[in-house]
A protein has these predicted regions:
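N-terminal signal-anchor/start-transfer transmembrane helix
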Residues: 6-22
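Membrane-embedded catalytic cores of phosphoryl/pyrophosphoryl-handling enzymes
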Residues: 12, 16-17, 29-137
Length: 137
């Protein structure tokens, strides 16, 4: 059960922290952040590191399951901080180009979501939450 509980607790703590941080910043409760990707902390990092830590703690760091979970965690965190963040930057540039087209020709397009990935700090904080949940549970 710990293999499920640790990542779920890590995800819940990360998502709760995200709601609190964004609500304080906005000055009002903002539950919409629960349904979007990106932001502080990374719940993706929290959930995979919670699972990896629970496996390491209970099955051992020399187990095949730990090795698989660790590699999986690295892939997820690299994707969150690298690829999805780059896609978010590209979306920001495309949105500026579309704004220019609106002003020049009146072309109207839907804006792309820009907050897709995480900064390295957001990934690190999520990973720390996951490790903590895995060690505590």
């Amino acid at each position: 059960m710990t293999y499920l509980l640790a990542p779920l607790v890590a995800w819940t703590v990360a998502q709760t922290a995200k709601v609190i941080l964004y609500s304080v910043r906005a000055g009002r409760l903002n539950l919409r952040v629960l349904a979007v990707t990106g932001g502080m902390p990374s719940s993706h990092s929290a959930i995979v590191m919670g699972l990896t830590t629970a496996i390491g703690k209970h099955a051992g760091v020399a187990s095949p399951a730990f090795a698989i979970a660790l590699i999986f965690s690295f892939v997820v965190m690299y994707d969150a901080a690298g690829l999805r963040r780059a896609a978010g930057r590209q979306a920001a540039i495309l949105n500026r180009l579309v704004e220019d087209l609106v002003h020049m020709r009146g072309v109207q397009e839907q804006k792309l979501r820009e907050l897709l990935g995480h900064t390295p700090v957001e990934v690190l904080v999520g990973a720390v939450l996951g490790v903590a949940a895995g060690l505590i549970l």
